[in-house]
Amino acid sequence: MKLILIYLILVFNLFNFINCQNILKVSNVRFAQTHVIPIEGKSWNIQGSTKHMSIVGKRRALLLASFQDQNLSYFATIWYDGGKVGMIQLNDPSQLPLTEDNGEKYSKVHHSGMIPKEWVRVGMKIQFSSFGGINGTEVSDILSPDVGQDYTLKMWILPFYLFGANDTNTQPFSKTKGIDSGISKELIEKWSCSDLQADNHPIQKIDWPYFVMEPRSGNPAMVITNSDQKKDGYAIMNGVLSILWLLRGMFGESSSSIQIYSPLLHLDAKGRYADTYGGLGGSSAGTGNHRFTGIFIHEQGHAMGLPHAGEAYDNKRKYPYKQGSLSGSEWGFDANHNEFLGTFIPPTAELYKTCKKNSIIDSKGRCVKQSVMQSGAGDQSSKYRYSMFADFEMTTIQNYFKNSIYYDETNGKYKKWNDTSKSYYAYKPITKEKGFEGVDENTPIERNVDIYSIIFTYSTVEKPKVGKISQIYPLLKSKGNLIRQFDPTNKKEMDSVNPKLNGEFKWYCNSSGCDYTIRVTFYDSSLKHVLLQQGKRKYKLPTGSFRDNINDPKSSDSFMLGGVNIKANKKIKKVELLETPFAWNGIPKNPTVLVSKSF
């Protein structure tokens, strides 16, 4: 019996010895998408808050791994949910993709291979293996990459043609209405997303002979008919941005991740094209010139929540790399060109020859790139349209998508991402704070129907028949969405928003009151009333006094930009802005008409 026991122990130890010998040792495993990051993702601690960058799901990735014996053949097997998805053979280090402009190699020790996007998903497992070594077949431990959300970045392009700008004297609509496939492919490589869908907005374009500027920088609201009349360089773009935010709300997209960008084409006092020489962006929208180059990607960075990198660095190091540079960032990777993007400025870059005047210099005497969000345009190789973001900035972009509501067109339902379970879940939009932020998170109640978009401006200080600040822009007809609206002639609906009652939406008017109504008259003489969630009251005092500066023409308190979408099942004859203070009490038969326009 004792001999049998000794024999079993020897066999057991021999089995363990063989197994130990057959375990393949692998190190420094990385995934390259926008940036080359560890398989477990990358984290930063910023002011006591952890920021994390994950691998993006449903996006191809270059797999990199280092092995002790570089001369063997290595394979990576992808597993999912207990089943084998597929296997790829890794290229040896001599075949590692090059660096832009034939720069320094990323590594001399990494084997590599491209993993198809279909294999990159939450729950995937990777196991490496080798054949032909002195130990025979060797397999590694199973590794679990930190794969996160998969999502498509959807973007509307809505050109603004102002002051007589048209296809002939500026740029043709065929070029400004969207971005071509080449640009889209490069943007996907720069943005942390699974895919990009950029289309012309359903409105197609906005073509107005004049533009109403809100009070800004100590100047009153004004109507301008050429770009030279603006008081500062960003004034018109600021007004365009306000309209884009308004449209996102009108179309029920304010809680979504859908972005909107407007190429701005306008004429100066002599009827010539006037460049924007810059851009503005934020809160899912951006505007600038029509070229879709550095300004465009910078402003859409702001649209996704990114600040200027240098300013964030100076502000308690909320950006981790010196002066808004990429000094310390992981390298980038472009799968379209199958090459690495160093954090240093390459020889063919526009700014290469003069970069040492202003750039940070690395330990090898090279100029370090700046982030796209801090003067980085021009730091890229001449083959690229755009320069790089820092790896850290991908955390903000990823969070932008994690916090959004998604509409699933396949089943007509909504979903959100749960970052703990790493999965989408069915979601029903809710009304927050009793309607203070709108109803059902301002999601549409009808989609893809014929609509009119009505946009207006109103000044509380403009005298009747003097000036044109209080006006209604030309109607915009398109296919679009409708959100929940309230009719001030319907008592039941008004009771639901009455701040004095305990209705479902009793805080709907809490921001500034509900003092205005849009009235639409159709050619069949029927009427439609839409209560606006806008007023002239102090914040959270819907029944209280007016805002302090409501009579100051230089204050935003005296100006209102508003709009609604209505179904285009009838032809509109007239649109009016009515003064309907405390509209929840009902409106008079003959309310004061503040603005009127016939069509």
Curated annotation (Swiss-Prot):
Keywords: Hydrolase, Metal-binding, Metalloprotease, Protease, Secreted, Signal, Zinc. It comes from Dictyostelium discoideum. This is Dictomallein-2. The lineage of its organism: Eukaryota, Amoebozoa, Evosea, Eumycetozoa, Dictyostelia. Its cofactor is Zn(2+). Zn(2+) binds at residues 298, 302, 308. Coiled coil: none annotated. PROSITE patterns: PEPTIDASE_M66. InterPro entries: Dictomallein, Peptidase_M66_dom. Its EC number is 3.4.24.-. It is found in: Secreted. The gene is dtmlB. Belongs to the dictomallein family. Binds 1 zinc ion per subunit. GO terms for biological process: proteolysis. Residues 1-20 form the signal peptide. Residues 145-407 form the Peptidase M66 domain. GO terms for molecular function: metal ion binding; metalloendopeptidase activity. The active site is at residue 299. Pfam families: Peptidase_M66.
